[in-house]
């Protein structure tokens, strides 16, 4: 069995065994260097194929049954070989008389086919590659490139054309028609929030306990419990009104004189050296007024004569009353709510209790409140500053107590002048706002900051939009970038990331035929830095097609060789 291939003598012997004439293959005189080192001869490829075909036809006429066999060529580690496989088949023949003849025929056939395959491989290696095998003709059909690609494969128009004036027949890419990606969607509107403006009554004092009503500041009443001189005068006036009483003290009794038992004044006109009756006038508070003497016909008050015992009793009574007044002193107004001691003097009344002025203090800072307004929280007094620090709501912006109007928004309390737009710093005054990341924005700044911008006008999109080319568009702005016309059925062409209609896309891409002025789709001729339909790339004089041959350019126009020589030679 041959392993390196059959030479021509072996092939002749094989054909002689088969009853055929010798091969008529001629060996060329030129020796070519091939990849197979074992053979230095070059055979004509077509003659070898014709010879093999005749052998196959001869074998088909043989009466014995031949099975289909495919034998690969032996591997050569030095070169890359092409595996050629041939299949030979025949109709089933009648039952052979002897089994041994069939087996011998099969063995011979195996040797024959293996030798043929080896010879064919060797012959193919010896045949040099001609330039025509690498020429792609202009009329060859190449598959169209993928969509949105601007590059294409270039094929030479003819192997006989000159290098500098070859019209290149190329396949123009189909413009990418985008139909499914241009969809109209409606953007979800952001949530609109409402700021609540709160105003409290009175002094607008806020408490941390929302269930309780806002306390109002209370006023303090101060009184003085020390009795004045007017009060003492009134007391004495009520006890003893002034009454003038004339008391006559009788002289000592003289035995030689007559006693006078009349209760009236006696005027004795004796010698001054004699004893006289003394008259003493004394103003005494006796607690009652004199009654007129009914025996007096002239209705005049006659002085009352007080004996010595009555005068002593009266003096003792007055002395006792004065002592009682001195020992009693001022009366207590009550017990102080701070120190629990009696209150004498100035008193402060607040929260239903009495206080010493120095004991009525703020429960938090212990500063005396005096007659200032105070705030009551849990039955305890607080000054205004401490009450705001402890119980008033705090502004989310400045963290200061809110004692005036406040705005409730975003779950927090704000001063009216501190609840403003994060971007423009304008107050909302209880109006609508938009929230993003816990911060308020007005409508204009919210859309200008966070909304998607249109690919045509670069303005924020608030309503419906079109999704195309990886961005969003206002429906009225998604138009051809050249003629500003809307697209029919949503079909458009992309060039440079912008949408175009069919006509202006080819103008922008330079894919307009220079001959007819229409868009070039499919195969085209690239010549003179222009694109042409293959049927429109013709000689400017004789109008014969030039796509398959050479041309000569003159003044920017193509000419065939004959016309160019006639016109410009």
From Swiss-Prot:
Q: Does the keyword Protein biosynthesis apply?
A: no
Q: Where is the composition biased (Polar residues)?
A: 62-78, 162-188, 196-206
Q: Name one GO molecular function term.
A: metal ion binding
Bias category Basic residues: which stretches? 258-272
Q: Which GO terms describe its cellular component?
A: cell cortex; filamentous actin; filopodium; filopodium tip; focal adhesion; protein-containing complex
Sorted alphabetically, which CDD domains does this protein's record hold? Answer: LIM3_Paxillin_like (cd09338), LIM4_PINCH (cd09334)
Give the residue ranges of motif LD motif 3. Answer: 232-239
What is the reported tissue distribution? Expressed in the upper and lower cup of the fruiting body.
Start and end of every LIM zinc-binding domain? 334-391, 393-452, 453-510, 511-569
Q: Which SMART domains match?
A: LIM
The record ties this protein, via Gene3D superfamilies, to:
Cysteine Rich Protein
Motif range (LD motif 2): 106-112
- List the effects observed when the gene is inactivated: Cells are less adhesive to the substrate and remain competent to aggregate, although multicellular development is severely impeded from the mound stage. They are defective in proper cell type proportioning, cell sorting, slug migration and form defective fruiting bodies.
Q: Where is the composition biased (Low complexity)?
A: 79-102, 150-161, 207-217, 273-301
Concerning SUPFAM superfamilies, the annotation shows: Glucocorticoid receptor-like (DNA-binding domain)
| Placement of sequence motif LD motif 4 | 311-318
> Which keywords are on file for this protein?
Cell adhesion, Cell junction, Cell projection, Cytoplasm, Cytoskeleton, LIM domain, Metal-binding, Repeat, Zinc
The family line of this record is: Belongs to the paxillin family.
Protein name per the record: Paxillin-B
This chain's source organism reads Dictyostelium discoideum
The encoding gene is paxB
